[in-house]
Regions:
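Residues immediately within or flanking Cys/His clusters that coordinate Zn2+
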Residues: 1, 17-19, 46-50, 68
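Short cysteine-rich clusters marking metal-coordination/redox-active sites
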Residues: 4-7, 22-25, 53-56, 71-74
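Conserved small/polar residues in nucleotide/adenosyl-binding loops
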Residues: 358-360
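Short cysteine/histidine-rich zinc-coordinating motifs and their immediately flanking basic loops
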Residues: 16-21, 34-39, 64-70, 83-89
């Protein structure tokens, strides 16, 4: 735990000021000035308290030793087991820039469209359970260098004939992609991490454990080799899009598929950095059903896997069905053509409602 040099109070990372704040005397400090000592800067490890859920086995860690009384992964309300441990130091971190209140506001805005969600998910006490967790990521630096030859063609019509000229387009490639990121935690579902992406890696800062004060961090248990091919493939997609849409070729169109351009990129992974990215995390548990709401701690982007309240669903269906029944019986004679049109309108409304809900 970080203590205030002025009064001995607890220091936490304050998102609004991007500095360390004393909870007692309100003094601010630079996170990098609260030293672990010069030897610690060269160390590959740092001290943490690891909290383990006795029910699901999920682990989070913190530089604080305060008691964690619920699990963010399975939603269990239980005191987590704790132990002192050492963790490998990340190279970089993206500090939280969205406060808990920002996070709650974004979540409430999304929940206005969640008509069939259980009312508990809109309760202020429940929403206050958002927990700030730094999720581990691997950030890949991919380079593409060397000569490349692409095929192109240009067609023109003369009378009744179309003439096509074929070209070899020669160039030297020098592309650098830094910060292609994939989450490094098996407990953090890839679908969730993709839903709240991207992060702006230009705002990464050098890591110091002070950034974790007042927050938690997940442990990295997925090796960097798992996503190497995905990183190379993603870099290839970016190069293909750029070559296809941004390079002027004088009317010559590329005669190359995405896969062939990727194969000619000579991609190499230059380096892989261990990083931490900020996520506001909220879990909901009802019997065996666990649902999550996550907010990108840098951009405020929200993603949620929301359960459906059966009671609200049937109530909403009844409210919709009754006026339709009255309308059809009082004002229309049900003929095949009328019925077909009514069904088409209802289907269109249903599709619109469905699309609006799946984008939550």
């Amino acid at each position: 735990m970080y203590q205030c040099p002025n009064c001995g109070g607890r220091l936490i990372f304050d998102i609004s000021s991007q500095s360390m704040l004393c909870e007692h005397c309100n003094t601010h400090y630079n996170p990098y000035k609260l030293g672990e000592g010069n030897s610690a800067e060269e160390s590959k490890e740092y001290d943490v308290t690891v909290f383990k859920c006795p029910q699901c086995g999920g682990e989070i860690m913190s530089t604080d030793n305060t008691i964690a009384d619920f699990c963010s992964f399975c939603g269990a309300s239980t005191v987590l087991e704790s132990r002192i441990s050492k963790e490998l130091r990340p190279g970089y971190i993206i500090p939280f820039s969205k406060t808990k209140q920002d996070c709650k506001n974004q979540y409430k805005k999304m929940m206005k469209r969640a008509w069939f969600a259980p009312k508990e998910l809109k309760d202020e006490k429940y929403i206050d359970g958002f927990r700030g967790i730094y999720m581990p990521y691997w950030a890949y630096h991919v380079s593409q260098k060397g000569p490349v030859v692409l095929r192109g063609e240009k067609s023109k019509r003369r009378g009744d004939y179309i003439y096509t000229d074929h070209f070899n387009i020669n160039g030297d490639m020098d592309c650098q992609y830094k910060g292609i990121s994939f989450d490094a935690s098996s407990s953090f579902d890839d679908n969730i991490s993709e839903a709240i992406a991207p992060y702006d890696v230009k705002n990464m800062a050098g890591f110091t454990p002070a950034f974790l004060s007042g927050f938690y961090a997940d442990t990295a248990d997925v090796g960097c080799d798992v996503y190497m091919n995905d990183a190379i493939d993603m870099a290839g997609e970016e190069t293909y899009d750029y070559v296809s849409n941004n390079i002027p070729l004088g009317g010559v169109s590329l005669h190359e598929t995405e896969s062939t351009i990727k194969s000619k990129c000579n991609a190499v992974i230059e380096s892989v950095d261990r990083t931490l990215y900020p996520v506001w995390f909220l879990s909901y548990r009802n019997r065996d059903r666990v649902a999550y709401a996550t907010v990108n701690g840098q951009t405020g982007k929200v993603s949620a896997d929301l359960p459906v309240s059966v009671g609200r669903y049937f109530a909403g269906s009844a409210l919709l069905a009754v006026p339709i029944f009255i309308l059809l019986n009082m004002f229309f004679t049900l003929r095949p053509k009328v019925t077909l049109n009514v069904v088409a309108v209802i289907a269109l409304i249903t599709i619109i409602l469905y699309l609006s809900l799946i984008h939550i």
